Amino acid sequence: ELTKGKAGFEIYDGFKPQPGEKIFTKTVNSCFKESGLLEYLREKQAKEVVIAGLMTDYCIDATVKCGFEHGFSIIVPKHANTTTDNEYMTGKQTYEYYNGFIWQGRYAHCISPEETIERMKR
């Protein structure tokens, strides 16, 4: 379950925030709505945002499109989002549909993790 306080909400150990890093909690599909993240990114004059997580066809899609609408260059590392099967497509098909068709070249740069890391070093 993806609810604060539940096991499914916990941050993977390899991605846990470092001391002093800011944490934003979202309560709706896009992380930009009423979380303070948008204001923080604007204050920091961020130009590029890397997006990863669950669920491809809900929260990730909303965040990618909202980030794009707010003027950010959006990076979605390959295999850094996932979802479940629905009544129309398998999770894999949904992933491929969004990452390979809907976002790529329109709203985001869907690139390899290695390329993402290189861009983050700039």
PLM regions and their residue ranges:
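Active-site-adjacent betaalpha module
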Residues: L2-R122
